[in-house]
């Protein structure tokens, strides 16, 4: 990674129930001949020496794609905010790139743009499509961990709302930017 970018950890969230996938673990579902998480891992691997996957099941399968695997502190799939908190606790670098396991079209250019924006403003950076924030495409300073923990303790479960408690820089992306496609149903995997 160019010197202009701070060292970063990568946090891939793969801890969901997969309800729209019939309960299947989305990150391990095949797309174009390999698991979805493998596509994301291949893009981000050159960017970091600390790839963390937050998952609540199939941890052994995910170990093949990560330097560290963590689970949520609470059982029963508490949601992405819990996964981010768990991942930030073990991340080795002060900046953390946050991605979902089911976004195989993400590319290094998008990640580098987020890192550049975060570093320039010394704050979190998140993709924004018009009025809509996309928290699963973010760069976070590790120092937001206490803010997220406080939000969790206060009953907040929305990752986006918790992240927006602090300054966040928006990286504008078009509504139809295919790099942001995530696969939330079996039908979307057919494309």
From Swiss-Prot:
<comment type="similarity">
    <text>Belongs to the MobA family.</text>
</comment>
<feature type="binding site">
    <location>
        <position position="26"/>
    </location>
    <ligand>
        <name>GTP</name>
    </ligand>
</feature>
<dbReference type="Pfam" id="PF12804">
    <property type="entry name" value="NTP_transf_3"/>
</dbReference>
<keyword id="KW-0963">Cytoplasm</keyword>
<keyword id="KW-0547">Nucleotide-binding</keyword>
<dbReference type="InterPro" id="IPR029044">
    <property type="entry name" value="Nucleotide-diphossugar_trans"/>
</dbReference>
<dbReference type="GO" id="GO:0061603">
    <property type="term" value="F:molybdenum cofactor guanylyltransferase activity"/>
</dbReference>
<dbReference type="GO" id="GO:0005525">
    <property type="term" value="F:GTP binding"/>
</dbReference>
<protein>
    <recommendedName>
        <fullName>Molybdenum cofactor guanylyltransferase</fullName>
        <ecNumber>2.7.7.77</ecNumber>
    </recommendedName>
</protein>
<keyword id="KW-0808">Transferase</keyword>
<dbReference type="GO" id="GO:0046872">
    <property type="term" value="F:metal ion binding"/>
</dbReference>
<dbReference type="InterPro" id="IPR025877">
    <property type="entry name" value="MobA-like_NTP_Trfase"/>
</dbReference>
<dbReference type="InterPro" id="IPR013482">
    <property type="entry name" value="Molybde_CF_guanTrfase"/>
</dbReference>
<comment type="subunit">
    <text>Monomer.</text>
</comment>
<comment type="function">
    <text>Transfers a GMP moiety from GTP to Mo-molybdopterin (Mo-MPT) cofactor (Moco or molybdenum cofactor) to form Mo-molybdopterin guanine dinucleotide (Mo-MGD) cofactor.</text>
</comment>
<keyword id="KW-0479">Metal-binding</keyword>
<feature type="binding site">
    <location>
        <begin position="13"/>
        <end position="15"/>
    </location>
    <ligand>
        <name>GTP</name>
    </ligand>
</feature>
<dbReference type="GO" id="GO:1902758">
    <property type="term" value="P:bis(molybdopterin guanine dinucleotide)molybdenum biosynthetic process"/>
</dbReference>
<keyword id="KW-0342">GTP-binding</keyword>
<feature type="binding site">
    <location>
        <position position="102"/>
    </location>
    <ligand>
        <name>Mg(2+)</name>
    </ligand>
</feature>
<feature type="binding site">
    <location>
        <position position="72"/>
    </location>
    <ligand>
        <name>GTP</name>
    </ligand>
</feature>
<dbReference type="GO" id="GO:0005737">
    <property type="term" value="C:cytoplasm"/>
</dbReference>
<feature type="binding site">
    <location>
        <position position="102"/>
    </location>
    <ligand>
        <name>GTP</name>
    </ligand>
</feature>
<keyword id="KW-0460">Magnesium</keyword>
<keyword id="KW-0501">Molybdenum cofactor biosynthesis</keyword>
């Amino acid at each position: 990674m160019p010197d202009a970018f701070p060292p970063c950890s990568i946090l891939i969230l793969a801890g969901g129930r997969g309800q729209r996938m019939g309960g299947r673990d989305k990150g391990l579902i095949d797309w174009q001949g390999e698991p979805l998480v493998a596509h994301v891992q291949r893009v981000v691997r050159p960017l970091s020496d600390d790839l963390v996957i937050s998952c609540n099941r199939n941890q052994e399968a995910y170990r093949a794609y990560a330097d560290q695997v963590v689970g949520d502190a609470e059982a029963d799939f508490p949601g992405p905010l819990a996964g981010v908190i768990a991942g930030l606790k073990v991340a080795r670098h002060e900046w953390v790139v946050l991605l979902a396991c089911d976004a195989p079209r993400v590319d290094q250019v998008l990640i580098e743009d987020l890192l550049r924006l975060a570093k320039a403003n010394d704050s979190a950076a998140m993709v924004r499509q018009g009025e809509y924030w996309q928290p699963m495409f973010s760069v976070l300073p590790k120092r937001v961990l206490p803010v997220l923990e406080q939000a969790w303790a206060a009953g907040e479960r929305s990752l986006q709302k918790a992240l927006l408690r602090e300054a966040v820089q928006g990286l504008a992306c078009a509504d139809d930017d295919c790099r942001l496609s995530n696969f939330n149903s079996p039908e979307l995997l057919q494309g």
